[in-house]
């Protein structure tokens, strides 16, 4: 009987297929169980780290912070939560004093954040922002005066909220602060060498005597010219900012908004102010020698004693 023969021939294949399907289901089930187990381990690690943040011991708290950093590296799903937790830690443990010291232009010489605050800032600075998933690093109204260098590599605070933060004497060298909110922040005597502030919002910010450019130069590989280590303030909003006495020599301020800004006694030698808006700005005794001023708007600006401005502005 032909069908009996066909059945006999097909049975081994059917059995093999059944075995394959069973194995596939087992592998799938094992994979699901493994993911559940891994997620459970991360949850346990997260809970332990959070508990450590509440410890009285600085060493235990630091351990908790670095444990959260490892969780960010191991779990992209938990990355945004960790960013929010660490940001909240800074806001809770380093708030502005009730006196509102961020409005003062006094220096913060000798002052620096506690070790745990510095550590949290370092962790946030070196996270992978691609996994933030819309979460903002919210350090608004915090006291970060005297913040030390955050090391080498990528220092990313792009689009961070630093509204009203006290950053007097902070070292923000080479940090990416593009599109960051720095409304009313105090950056008196802060170091901004090589900082990217492109499109940042600095309305009412205080940058008195801020170190913006270094005295050293490097050779630009594209142009072959000597270039200063200066921040990029292209299109930055500096409306009503206090920049009196600031060292802004060779700074890129292309298209920047400086309406009503206080630039008295500021050094802007060699700065690029192409298409910048300086309407109603106070430019008295500022030095614009060698600055690029094509397309700059100076309507209503106070220019008494300013050097390097076109005669038509007087």
What are these regions (language model features)?
Residues 6-13, 25, 59-61, 78, ...:
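Positions within the helices of HEAT/ARM-like alpha-solenoid repeats
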């Amino acid at each position: 009987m032909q069908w009996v023969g066909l059945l006999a021939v097909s049975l081994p294949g059917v059995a093999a297929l059944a075995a394959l399907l069973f194995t596939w289901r087992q592998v799938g089930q094992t994979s699901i169980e493994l993911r559940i187990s891994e997620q459970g381990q991360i949850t346990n690690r997260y809970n332990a780290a959070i508990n450590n943040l509440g410890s009285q011991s600085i060493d235990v708290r630091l351990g908790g912070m670095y444990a959260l950093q490892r969780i960010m590296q191991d779990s992209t799903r938990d990355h945004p939560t960790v960013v929010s937790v660490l940001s909240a830690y800074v806001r809770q443990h380093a708030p502005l004093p009730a006196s509102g010291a961020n409005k003062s232009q006094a220096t913060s010489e000798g002052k620096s954040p506690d070790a745990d605050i510095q550590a949290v800032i370092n962790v946030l600075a070196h996270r992978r922002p691609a996994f933030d998933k819309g979460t903002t690093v919210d350090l608004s109204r915090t006291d970060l005066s005297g913040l030390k260098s955050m090391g080498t590599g990528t220092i990313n605070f792009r689009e961070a909220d630093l509204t009203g933060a006290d950053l007097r004497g902070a070292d923000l060298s080479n940090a990416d602060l593009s599109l960051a909110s720095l409304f009313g922040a105090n950056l008196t005597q802060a170091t901004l060498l090589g900082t990217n502030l492109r499109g940042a919002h600095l309305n009412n910010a205080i940058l008195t005597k801020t170190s913006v450019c270094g005295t050293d130069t490097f050779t630009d590989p594209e142009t072959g010219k000597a270039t200063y280590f200066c921040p990029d303030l292209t299109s930055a909003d500096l409306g009503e900012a206090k920049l009196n006495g600031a060292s802004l020599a060779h700074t890129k301020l292309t298209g920047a908004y400086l309406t009503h800004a206080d630039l008295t006694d500021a050094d802007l030698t060699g700065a690029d102010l192409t298409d910048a808006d300086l309407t109603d700005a106070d430019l008295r005794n500022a030095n614009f020698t060698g600055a690029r001023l094509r397309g700059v708007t100076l309507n209503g600006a106070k220019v008494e004693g300013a050097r390097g401005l076109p005669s038509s502005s007087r």
